[in-house]
Each structure stands twice: as C-alpha cells, then as structure tokens.
Amino acid sequence: MTSTSPKSRKSSSKRKGSKKKAARSKNVIPPLSKTPPSFRNCVVDKKSLKQLVAWAFKNHGTAVTAAMADNLKDLGFKYATQAAVSISVDDLKVPEAKQDLLGQAEEQITATEECYRLGEITEVERHTKVIDTWTETNERLVDAVKKNFNHNDPLNSVWMMANSGARGNMSQVRQLVGMRGLMANPQGEIIDLPIRTNFREGLTVTEYVISSYGARKGLVDTALRTADSGYLTRRLVDVAQDVIVREEDCGTTRAILINAEDGRFGNRLVGRLVAEDIVDQEDAVIAKRDTAIDPELSKKIEKANVNGVMIRSPLTCEATRSVCRKCYGWALAHNQLVDLGEAVGIIAAQSIGEPGTQLTMRTFHTGGVSTAETGVVRSNLAGKVEFGPKARVRGYRTPHGVEAQQAEVDFLLHIKPTEKGKGQKVEISSGSLIFVEDGQEVDADVTLAQIAAGAIKKSVEKATKDVICDLAGQVRYEEAIQPKEVTDRQGNITLKAQRLGRLWVLAGDVYNLPPNAKPVIASNANVQAGKVLAEASQSSEFGGEVRLRDSIGDSREVQIVTTSMTLKDYNLLEESNHSGEIWNLEANDGTRYRINSIPGSKIGNNEVIAELSDDRFRTKTGGLVKYAPGLAIKKARSAKNGFEVSNGGSLLWIPQETHEINKDISLLMIQDRQWIEAGTEVVKDIFSQTAGIVTVTQKNDILREIIVRSGEFHLCTDSNILERFDNEGQIVNPGETIAKGIKPEAMVFVQTIETTEGKGVLLRPVEEYTIPDKAQLPELSHVTQQQGPSLGLKATQRLGYKDGELIKSVEGVELLKTQLILETFDTTPQMTVDVEVTEDQSTKTIQRLRLVILESILVRRDTISDSSHGSTHTELQVKDQQIVKAGDIVATTQILCKEKGIVQLPEMKEDEPIRRLIVERQEDTVTLTAASKPVVKIGQRVIDGDLLSNEEPINCCGEIEAIKENKVTLRLGRPYMVSPDSVLHVKNGDLVQRGDGLALLVFERQKTGDIVQGLPRIEELLEARRPRDSAILCKRRGIVEINQGDDDDSVVVKVIESDDLIEEYPILLGKNVMISDGQEVKAGELLTDGPVNPHELLECFFGDLRDRKPLMEAAQEAIAKLQHRLVTEVQNVYKSQGVAIDDKHIEVIVRQMTSKVRIEDAGDTTLLPGELIEIRQVEDTNQAISITGGAPAEFTPVLLGITKASLNTDSFISAASFQETTRVLTEAAIEGKSDWLRGLKENVIIGRLIPAGTGFSGFVEELRAEAGPHPDILAEDPAGYRRIQNLRPDYTVEMPSSPAAANLTSVLDDPSDADLEATRNRHGIDPSTSNFAAFARPSGDDNFQEDQSPDPAALEGLQEEGLLSDE
C-alpha cells in the first residue's frame, strides 16, 4: 500500500463523498511517512524533551504530538511511581574535595593578608582579591559537586532533579551540599566573610544572621516585583493593542541586518523572512527573498559562513498602522506564517510583560569580578619570551595589586623554546595585561597574559575605602608618595598622595594628653616608669569660697561660691501637705510667698522664685474680665506666664457660672432661659451656686454647657434700648439712667436677654479690683560685687487674662499674681543660681533662704593607665572653705609614664598645643645580629624578606635605628600601601593611636550602582527616561582633540568635524573621558562615561545624517539606529536573567515608540508646527504636496515612552481608557476628533466585534460597505485602507453645523468621473502608479474583474484540498 499523507487521504474521501469509507479510514493509524524512524539512545533531560516535542510537532502535527506527550507523561508517572524519588538528608552528599578547596582558598587569603601586612597591596586590592578568591572557590566547588554526583551517585534524587531540570538548579544544590558563598550587606556591598558551610552541615549563628539580609531582600523584592510587572504589562498592551496583521505584503525594500555572533546566529533568524537573497562565498543563492528561515536553513546559513543576513522586520514594515505578514514572519505559536487579523501587538506586550516577575529588582555589587570577559593565556612550553619590535607597553597595576604591563597596541608575543621544537605565538590585543617581561625565561603553564575582550572601555565610578591603623606609633611617609596639598572650590585643603607608595607607622607608646596639659620633659630624654611626662592645672575663673564635695563617678567636684545673697527679713517655713513639701517665705507683716524653686534646685536668669499668696484677687466663680481705662500691660511674646502690668488701675469682673456637661439632654431638669434660685439642681447631681437666668447650649441632643447669669431682670419693649445693649453688653456707671425707671446705684453690666417671660435687660453686678502700680518686695534686693557676677530680685505683677476674656468655670480663678523674679548680671550663660537653706546667724531655729552662684570645677581622679592614656595623679591645691582669688590654681594633674623608654615630642608650630607624645619602649625595637657585615643603612625601612647581610633575610618590618658592628637595632613598624590620589589624613611625623584613620583610598570600580538591573532598567528603556547625569555624546563625526582646561582637573574635548568646524565639549569634574586623542568618532559615540540619554542619541544620529541625506532618509536611518539599540538593550536585560524573548516582540513595541515625528515647519501642507504625527502620514502628505509643487513639511523624529505613546494614539477612546481620562476627552472634544475604531480597545469599550481573528474579514467587508462611493475615506489599495487626509484641492469637506443638520447635509461632495479625470490630467498622474488609486473610484462589487480572473492551477489546487466544491 502506497502511503499517502493524512491530509490528501482526508480530502479524497471528502471528494468521493463516501461516508462508509470515511468511517473506516478513521480507525487506521496514518503511517508517519514524512521522516524515517530514528533511534536515539541517550539520557533525556528537560532540554531534550523540549526538542523531542518540537520535532514531533514540526513533522507530524498537533494530534500526533498530543498523543506522544500523553504517552511520555504516562511513562514518566509510571517510572516516578516505581522509583519513588524523594529527598532525604542522606541524599545530600557533601563532596570530599570541599575541605581541600576551602584549604586552598584559606592559603590564598592568608598570602593576600601577608602581602597587605607587608604593605605590598592596598586595602582595596586586598578586599578585591579576597572576594575574587571566594568567588572562584565557589565555582570550583560547584564543579566538584557535579563531579561527585556524576561519578559516585548518578541516581541520587537531588542530582536527578537538578540535572534533568525537573526541579531546582545548580545554584540551589550548591547551597545544599557545597557552600552558601558570599553575601551582601543591606548597602549592597559584599561582606568578605563568606558562608563556608552548607545547609547539610548547618550554619553557625553568625552565618545565619548574615544570611538573613538576603532573605528579607528576596521577600521584599518579590512583593514589589509583582505590582511593577503588572503595571508594565498594562502599559505595553495599551501601546501595542492596535497592531494587527492587516496586509499580506507591504512590499518594502527596507530591512534590518542581523550579524552572527562568533559565527553563530542561534535562534535569532528562525521564523523571519529573508529581505535580500542570501549568497555564500561562491555566490550561490542559499535562500531567496521572502523565504521563511527555519532551524535547518539557519544552520545551513551558519555553515556557509555568512556573517550578516538582511531580514524583514516589524521595525521596517511600511504597512499603515499595522504590520504585514511577511515583515512579521512566523507566529511563534505554530511556527507558520502569521495569519491575517492576528493581534500581534497584544502578543508582544504579554511576551515582554509576563517574564517581568522573574527579573530581579537589583543585583548585588560584585567585588569587580571580571573573570568572565577576559581570557587568561598560559604558556604551553618552557622558553624565552620575546615581545617583538612592534610592541608598546606601559606599567599597570591590576585590581589585585599585581604589577603587570598593559599593551597599547596589538602585537604578537613569541615564546622561543629552550629545546628544539615549535614555539608559541600569543596574539596580544590592545588593552591586554601581560604578566611576563621581555626576554624573561618561563616554564610551561605560567600565566602569560590576560587578553582584553575587545576595546570595550567599561564605565567606572570612583569609590573610597578607609585605611585604619593597626598599632599606635609615629607616621612616616616614603618619598615615593610625594604628598601634595590640594585646595578644593570651598577652600578646604586636603593632602593627597601623587604616587603609589607606603605610609609607615613606627611602633611606640602614644599618650593622649588632656587639654591644657604641657609636657615637662625634653624630647629624646630617657624616662623610667612612674616619671611625670606632662602636667595640667585647673584654676578658678572668678574666685570665692571653696567647698569640697563628695566625689561623683570618676571625678571630684570643687565648688567655689562666687556670689551669695540671703533674704534676712523673711523666715523660711516648711509645710507638708498631701502633695509633698511646700516652702513659704513669711515677712514680718504677715505677707507670705509660696516658693516655686525648692531648696536644692537650680534656677536661671529671669526665672520665678516665689509667688505672693494673696486671696484678695481670687473670684468665687468664672466670669468676664474687663480692663478699666488706665490699666495697661506690657506686650509679651507668649501669654503662657500671663501679662505683666506696666500701669496700675482697676480690673472689672462680671461673674458668670458655667457648667460644662456633655451628657444626654434627657437629664436636664430645668427649662432654657428661666430664672432659677441658688442651689437649684440644673442637671442630675449638678447644682447652681448662684441665682440668675439659665442658658442651655446643646448640639445633636447632647447637652454641652449650662450658663447662669446673675443680676436683676427688667422686661423691656423699647427696641432702641434692646439694640443698645445687644451683642456684647455695656458697663453702666452708677446713677446713669438705662430706661424709664431703671437707674442702678452701683456699677452694672447691662445685657439684652430673652427669657421665658419675654425680652428685656439684665443688670449684672460688677466687682472692681484695684491693682497698685508697683508690687511690694522683700528688703535686700541686690548684691553687687566688683568682679564676677551679681544677683538681684525684682517683683512683677502678672494678670492671667486679657481684656474681654471669658473664663468658663464653676470654681473661682486668680486674676493677679505677684511674682519674685531672679535677675543676674555679668554672668556666663551656663552659670546657674543654686537655691539653698541656711540658719540665721543669731537665732539658730530660724531658717533663711540663700541664693548662691557657684563655679564648679571637675577634678579628675587618679586613673590607672590604659591603652591610650598614661596613669594620672591629681592633687588638690585648696582646702575646704578657703578663699581663693580669680586665676588661682585649684588642682594639678600629672601624667605618669607607664614603661621606661625614650620620649619623643611631635614637631609642632609654636602656638600649637601638644596633644600627644610618644615613648619608644624596649619592646618596640629588636636587635638583630648579622653573621657578616650588614648591608642596611641607618634610617632605611625594611620589610620581611629584605636582606640584613649578604645571606640573611630579615623576618620583621621596621626602620633601622642603629648599627654597631654586626648588631642592628630595628624599630618595629607597619607599612600601609596607598594608591595615587588617596587622601592622607595624617602628616609626616604625626602620632596615631590604634584605630585612627590614616588615609582614604580612592579607587575606580566598574559602575554597578546605577546600572539598574531587571525591571527598573526595562522600564527606563521602554519609558525612554532621561537618565540623571548622562554621558556626553558626540554630535557629528570627526577627529578628537583633548586639551587640559583652565584648572588641573578639567578637560576640554574638541571634535574637528568633516567641514573643519570645531565643536567643543567641556567635560565636568568626575567624568571619565572614554576616547583618546586623535581618535575618529562617529555621531552618537560616548565621549564620557555614564548612562546614555536615548533622546539625545536620536538627535545626534539625525543631526549627523541630515547633513548628508534627504530629510526622509535621514529620519528613517536615525530611527533605525536607535531602534536597533533599544532592542539590544532590552534583550540584554532579559538575557542577563536567563529569559528568552523573541526579538520580534520587542520590535513591535519599539516600532510604536518610534513611529512619530514632530513637525517643525509645515510648508504648504495643512499640518501644524509642533504636531506629533505618524512618519508614514507625513511621507504621503509630502509626496502629494510635491505633485502640486508646494513646499513639503520639515520634521524631526521623536522617541516616545510607552505611556506617552499610548496617550498619543489616534484613538482618543483608547487613550482616555488608559490614563488622564479628563484631559484626553476634553482635548478630543475641543479638536472635534473622530475615532476610527481601528484598535481592539476602542471596539471592546463600545461593544463591537473586535477587528482581529475571526472579526478581521468582517471588519474589511464592513469598511467597504461604509466607504461606498467616497474614495476619500478609503483608498482601494491592496496595502490596506489608507486614509488620505486633506490633500485634494478639489474636494471640500463640510462639517455639519448642528446634529439636526447632520442628517440632511451630505458630508462629502462626490465628484463626477469627469472631475476625477480632470484632476488626474492636471497632476499628470500615471494610471499604473499607486497614486492613481487615490484619485480613482473604487469598484462597488467584490466579484473578480476581467483582469483579475483566477489562475486555473490555483482553482484546481483548492479543489484538490477540498476547500472548493466541484461546481
């Protein structure tokens, strides 16, 4: 039986129409004839499974693949059930090699630390080396884990899961059985203590805590990522939702070039259509234009060594507002050419948005691990190194502190073998590091060089690290450092190292001297332990009587009474009540003052000491305060302490009882506005204290307050009188007539009031308080002295309330307070006054109040010596109650020497105090005996391994102090390497304690901080954000010239352009120049490091091309360059996270971002300057205008971020449903926009069928029907429905003036055939061009026209497939 394909059998059975046969043939399994069966014997992991399923799908279609996948699933389940793969603790096998690897790492790190100790590398280099060592160890351990499982236990559950790709990956297995590795702290810096253990061995507490940083970061990031990713997807969908495949072929000749990377294309060509024939080296055609590239063809192209392929892409598709099938290529869902009506925009948006959650927010700063980009070359044989005549190298220091040479040009490095045989050649590229010298003899397997990967200049940033001193001693510079004083713009002077060199600290015992201590011993003197090195004295500033206090803490207090004042005419009485003790001052006439500042407390200037206890100014209830004329108060900043009286007078008081209630209204027991007697119960359990008229305030059935106003009430009907006393009320003097028959005898306050009986006036009693001008004061109010501070008291009267203030209260209040206030003169601000109790000198039973001003001197007690201070001994020079003068010494402190040695004082300027001194002890020096004559000199500094005599190495670091015959005395020291440009915190000869900062190393590291990783970076690219502090870009191509600026640090870069114009680029401080003098640069190339501003880049590209090409070409080429860059950048982020996205998805989005131009000059078109418009629309407009001979529109291309592009779409319904709804709709209404409902969103919102998928062809029919006889709306054109706007000189568009008129007026005048003919002739339009269609009338029917009759072969093919009936 000849095998037929399933498809042909199906169609033939259909053609014969025999149902029986059809039913029978269903049961026969179609033989798989397309490919011969193949037998593969290998382990199938996740990747192979993918390939297997893809192969089945490609060769045998969906049904077979589904059946096979089902069978695979059953197979998997069956064996998984039998195998019972599970994880147990025993499955976690730690490789035995781990201890060796850790041991090796420890050795390397010990060696690094030793180099650091000897001052051979800087702190930064040490840190970098440690991090790199651990990173490398970790990698090697992963390999060991893989090897261990593969060799010893290939069926281990953990290994099978990770290896097959079923669950988990190697980085997780590494943490289970390898080591957890390096962790970062919250600032993103790597902690150089790695976690050496794994989860199988268990973590120590420290390691557990270090791990917790990362754990929290992971949780927080995940929570933030989901939200961010969702919003990104929404914006992408919005920008691309109207991209639908609407055409078969746009016919463009433009294309994009895809270059091979290392001779491979990978998957980048699969599913694309060829734009230009691909030919191999012999000019044989491999693939013709419009061939779809499948994986086989892709491999074939690679084999033919084709470097670049021109393919069709959505970026260059010329279909209007859509993409054509051929430019899009395969739909990746079924690996066939995409169907018409496919909503490729939404697919693109989802493909980019969906992996968003997998992207990390930020990655750690790695410690400059740059092993990936550079290849290390080792020698294959022993021999002699030769650089050759072309070589140019310069000295270079690697980040690990290894001295090497860097190649300035490309050259060949030869190794001439020592024995006969073939030598070795190494290609050295410019920028590579060479670790051997010219002419050096090397063994086999020696590292020769590190080859730089291309001339990529990494962007770097400056970072700093402190160098901390490990021992106390004296600083000495090496001459190599060449310190230089640098003044910055603020005038601060810093000391900087100009060259690489060592900074030494020579050991010694450094003493910190207290302030005002002076050395009492000469430099270079020998001292014994216990000898006085320095003395400090403390003296009294004002003098007075000495009081010695008990010691407090580690110091004793000496108090000196400088001023005192006793109040002799007042007795001090102590009373106690429930709230504690109360102190009162009582004068002979019985007036009493209550003391605020109790004895033992301290008070300052202008503070209140006591208040007069006076009941004369106390009221019975609350009320209203009025000042009578004459009474005046001082203005005060705050009314907290009341108002000070400046002029005495009368204070008037109108009593009024106020109860604040806040209870339910049902508890009220009286009526509003009725007269009540004293003692009436107004609310349950609340009684009135006075008689009068009640006012009740309530809100929402809650009683707020009840006011009782006492006085005489008179009914009154005279409206003038009622008006006169309305609102606030008035004071009426005695004898003045208020109304007929109402004449008060005393002063009253008259107010209009409404009661239950009716309106009238209430005469309220007024109490008058007389306030004197001056307050009375105890005798002896001042103590003055010639020198030092003076004391005084003054009395003030303060009113508690201002004029017209209402006091709501039931209890009484105090209207006036008389206060005693302290005044001090000539005092320092920190001086306080102490309040004390003394006995009267004549009668011991009476106590008096005494105010004293004390000078307090803290005297240090003797201290036993510690690491930074010598022991001190303090002696008091005064006795208790001794009188001292100002400037007398109260105590002296001596600093004693701890151990015997030689004293050295630092070199100081004359007026500078000495704050530290150093004693060089016996233990700070060592004496070495040389076997033969020493080769060292006095003053020379040596490190471990330097020679003492011809044979003997020295085993310590330090400075040679003396040489006597064969004995060499060495003062121990510690070298610290500092790199050029480091900031030095200490000067030569300075004394430092352990833990002091010596220098700040300034180093360059690869910029990682602002290369935002993952989602934020994707967002930055797609939103086309302008980065902060971006790189300076070259505007036009030319040759670079670099000059120094006015000051040392600044640089001026000049670019000499092709027409000899010179463009200057001033470069700011802190920017690194990325180009070299004499280099040729292109437009858009980076002159300095930093992130690139995409808008500026587009400007540079366009500006440069504009000079050489027509406007349209320049714009298209500039956009193409930018598009390529954007696609690459977005892909890089996803690739770095291991996410694979097809280029075409990103291209669809980027196309939407770059499809608009801004009109600069409208020419003779109807466009507006500043308008954003599709580039293809401008192209059409300019073409049409050029037919009429008018001036075309000038424009510049723009890049829009996805949000901006969404808001700038033609459809206002889509834009309004996205963001800024009100603004979009208002603008659309003002402009009278129409929405042509082209996209999906608009149609969904309105509730129509969406124009994609099955709705697509319906959409086409409907448009045709709508178009009718108006060629203006839709031009009949195979390239979709193109709206030609505002271009016909002989068409008028009348807008309806009102909705009613809209139904009557025809919107477009329909031209006659004659008109169209005339127009065509006028413009000389050839009927064969596409422009002809714009001026032709579309045919109304959809039948085949004569010249379009179908190809008979095509009809037969359709019949063959059963898609066309025999009729």
From Swiss-Prot:
Class of this enzyme: transferase
Record GO biological process: DNA-templated transcription
GO MF: DNA binding; DNA-directed RNA polymerase activity; zinc ion binding
Protein EC: 2.7.7.6
Positions with a binding annotation for Zn(2+): C250, C317, C324, C327
Quaternary structure (record): In cyanobacteria the RNAP catalytic core is composed of 2 alpha, 1 beta, 1 beta', 1 gamma and 1 omega subunit. When a sigma factor is associated with the core the holoenzyme is formed, which can initiate transcription.
Primary role: DNA-dependent RNA polymerase catalyzes the transcription of DNA into RNA using the four ribonucleoside triphosphates as substrates.
Name of protein: DNA-directed RNA polymerase subunit beta'
Organism listed in the record: Prochlorococcus marinus (strain SARG / CCMP1375 / SS120)
GN (gene name): rpoC2
